[in-house]
Amino acid sequence: MKNNYTSLKSSMDEGDELKTGHEFDLEKGILPEYNSEEEGALPPYSDISKLANPVPEDSSTGPTETTNPNVERRQEFKDSHPNIYSLLRLLISVLAVIVVFFTAWVCVNPLEKSIFGKVAFSVTIGITCPIVFIAIFCFFETWTQAVAQCIKVTVIFLAQCVKVTVISLAKCVKVIAVGLYNSKKDLVVTIWLAWVVICFILFGCVKDGRLNLNKALICSTSSISAALFFILLLVCIPIWTLKHMLFGLFQVLGVQSCVVIVTKGLMYLLDKHIDATGYEIEASSLFVIGNFLFFYEMERPGALKRMPKFIGNGIASFLGGIANAIRGIANAIGGIANAFRGANDNNDIPLGEMDVESEV
């Protein structure tokens, strides 16, 4: 008979065996006996021992020191090129002594006539220069590291200062721009009133004869307009819409130029020379047109682009209205004619027919 052997261990028992560590690692070998009576002893290969002793086994050499890469490069250069390194130290030391000597020559030499000047110059040349030479040549590495660290700290400090200054200026400009943009209506009215006052002053100077008429026309159409446009550019709209603003400015100046050309052409065609009154009318009309076009462009961007189409539609609507009016007048005249024609037809009925109709 075959003995059918079945294990009475359940899956939970097998899991407990794994947890208790009855299985041994093939690489580490069989676990040694564990004496629980020893104080502070922990079972080997356990996770608790790893946590209790986090220092690796090969850490007996001590902690490694972090070295500066600049110091390493300098040491490598010194070891590989000792002659060049010594020559460089000597050259820098001599240059420092030369700088000290010329500084003493410039500052102390004018006082050489006095005893104090002679003593100061002698001390500077005889004591200070050798001390500077010895200090720089013998302690070259120390003071170069100190100077490099000082330069590094200074550069970082200056960079931080520049960064903070730029950020502060940007915030100030943003606050000012937002404030001006939010209060644009009041400022626009103020600038517009100032423009009106300036133009009236110019017109008054023209009237009194203290200003040439051509200059008044140029000032009223070019200088004042350009100044106002650029001031309103900074007040009414953000600075980044400069392209749109300049385009509107050139469009307004173009319209003003067209008005000037048309006005002068009509006056010359009618054999009327432009006198003082003509110049005043022209300048005033340009002033009004410039104001209207500019404020209309500011309230509705792109209005100047749509203006030719708008004018064409207006002219077409006006001509259409005139055509409709003429058509209405023609229809009215036709109705009146039909009425007169009907009256004439009634008058042409014979008298005999009228008597017959009355008898019936």
Curated annotation (Swiss-Prot):
Bilayer-crossing regions: 90-110, 120-140, 150-170, 186-206, 222-242, 246-266, 276-296, 310-330
Protein name (database record): Meiotic drive suppressor wtf13
Role description: Acts as a suppressor component of the dual wtf meiotic drive system, and can suppress but not confer meiotic drive by compatible poisons. Wtf meiotic drive systems promote unequal transmission of alleles from the parental zygote to progeny spores by encoding a poison and an antidote from the same locus; the poison is trans-acting and forms toxic aggregates in all spores within an ascus, wherease the antidote is spore-specific and targets aggregates for degradation by the vacuole.
GO cellular component: cytoplasm; vacuolar membrane
Topology relative to the membrane: Multi-pass membrane protein
Family listed: Belongs to the WTF family.
Keywords assigned: Membrane, Transmembrane, Transmembrane helix, Vacuole
